[in-house]
Amino acid sequence: MKKEQLKDFDNLAQSLFYEMFGDPAENEKGWEVKKLGDISSIGTGSTPNRKNKDFYKNGTYPWVKSTEVCNLPIYSVEEYITEEALKNSNCTLYPPNTILMAMYGQGKTRGQIGLLKIEACTNQAVAAIMPTKEVVDEIFLSQHLMLMYEHIRNMARGGNQANLNLSIVKSIQIFLPPLSLQRLFAQRIEQIEREKSEVQKSIQDLETLLASRMQYWFE
């Protein structure tokens, strides 16, 4: 039951966006439209040489792969790189509130969005989008991009496995309601996320309790 509630929170966020701003694909409310590259700074990263163990052993800089970009806030990562790797590769350390977009990857990965909650680098399969704060709110923009998932995937180019690239990402059309309205939306989303986190914690607590009781009864 509680896991179903998590989906309800996601649906609520989407419904709130549609209610306040309309469909990003239709822009029936006639908001001003600009290219993503005109309202943000967009970069990417790289994969430090895997053969050099000094680039990964005891790494301290979070390094995000496209498979970890899955329409959720990013608080932690699977791998870390060292300062030496950062200095000797095309990796860039991006600040919290950078929006990440998976440009290619297996299955449904391409086009998915993540909002960095930590300072982190990325590999070359991820676009890092830093919104111009005077124009667009990062929470509004991340939700906008998530709702354009199918449209963005269809913009990909290539043969057997179509990919996005930075030029395509920069060309994505974004509508821009007044910043005050974007920020009001962001405040409501933050409240939804707080409530969602509470439900997630209660699920984790319940699973921990059940595991301990199973261990008690069967060992």
Regions found by a protein language model. Give the residues of each.
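Non-catalytic DNA-recognition/assembly elements of restriction-modification systems
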Residues: 4, 8-46, 171-183, 190-219
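Short coil/turn segments at secondary-structure boundaries
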Residues: 29-32, 49-56, 156-158
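Sequence-specific dsDNA recognition surfaces
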Residues: 37-52, 67-96, 122
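Short proline/glycine-enriched turn/loop segments at secondary-structure junctions
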Residues: 53-54, 116-117, 132, 160-164, ...
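A short beta-sheet element
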Residues: 65-66, 82-146, 165
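A short glycine-rich beta-alpha junction/loop motif
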Residues: 119-127, 158-183
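Short amphipathic alpha-helical signal-transduction/dimerization elements
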Residues: 145-149, 153
